[in-house]
UniProtKB/Swiss-Prot annotation:
Presence of keyword Hydrolase: yes
CDD domains cross-referenced by the UniProt entry: metallo-hydrolase-like_MBL-fold
Signal sequence segment: none
Molecular function terms from GO: hydrolase activity
Higher taxonomy: Bacteria, Pseudomonadati, Pseudomonadota, Alphaproteobacteria, Hyphomicrobiales
Protein name: UPF0173 metal-dependent hydrolase BOV_A0561
Family the entry assigns: Belongs to the UPF0173 family.
Domain of life: Bacteria
Pfam families reported in the protein's UniProt record: Lactamase_B_3
Species name: Brucella ovis (strain ATCC 25840 / 63/290 / NCTC 10512)
Keywords of this entry: Hydrolase
SMART domains with a match to the protein in the record: Lactamase_B
Length: 237
């Protein structure tokens, strides 16, 4: 399996049977400078969304139309995407597991919000925010936390799914900051590797992963992969 951070909370996950984009906010993403859009979206089979904010839905509609990708999202967000012309949708909700070729995806809790600003300036709620747990046939289990704060039920996510790779928001203000994110990783999980995200994009959130790296310094069993956007990481089962 290969995982590429595309800036902010966007990731490309490649396995033998699927190419999954998570929260594909590319155009207009300050953290995606230098990312080639065509290369980032090449061969995409699925798009998985954690919630309905514009910096996570991003280019979903355009990518889904161009590639015929299946979009996996909370039921309310999926309904909205359908109204925008997305044809291949697989809706779910918190606690649900969906099966696709080569992997399953489970919707778990996240402490955040989920809405889209409509053309008339009204904020439209788009269901609950989620974290997403991916179980693959031939690769380590991956948990993208979405946008969230720390919460004690992370312990149940670890008990049920035992994720080996964590994608963790660290930018503060709209999610937990680096020190709290490090505490979440150490207290509730046994990750082999973690990829921090939701930083180094907008100027009002943290510009570096320094606080997270410092917080993880006394937990050497977990490898922190805080590399620049565009870096490809490979993982074996």
């Amino acid at each position: 399996m290969k995982i590429t951070w595309l800036g902010h909370a966007a990731f490309r996950v490649e396995t033998a049977k699927a190419v999954i984009l998570i929260d594909p906010f590319l155009n207009g993403n300050p953290g995606a400078k230098g990312i080639d859009f065509k290369e980032a979206t090449r061969g995409v089979t699925h798009i998985a969304l954690t919630h309905g904010h514009g910096d996570h839905v991003g280019d979903t509609v355009a990518i889904a139309r161009e590639h015929g990708a299946t979009v996996i999202a909370n039921a309310d967000l999926a309904s909205w995407l359908g109204s925008q012309g997305v044809e291949k949708l697989d809706p779910g909700n918190t606690g649900g597991t969906l099966a696709h070729e080569g992997f399953t995806i489970t919707f778990v809790n996240a402490l955040h919000s989920s809405a889209m600003l409509t053309e008339n300036g009204v904020s439209q709620a788009l269901g609950n925010p989620n974290g997403l747990v991916f179980h693959f046939e031939d690769s380590p289990t991956l948990y993208h936390m979405g946008d969230t704060d720390i919460f004690s039920d992370m312990a149940f996510i670890n008990e049920l799914h035992q994720p080996e790779i964590g994608i963790v928001p660290i930018g503060d203000r709209f999610t937990m900051g680096g020190a709290v994110a490090a505490l979440a990783c150490q207290r509730y999980f046994n990750f082999n590797s973690v990829l921090p995200c939701h930083y180094a994009s907008f100027p009002i959130i943290d510009r570096t992963a320094d606080k997270f790296i410092a917080g993880m310094a006394d937990h050497p069993a977990t490898k922190v992969l805080a590399d620049p956007a565009g870096t490809v990481h490979s993982f074996q089962a």
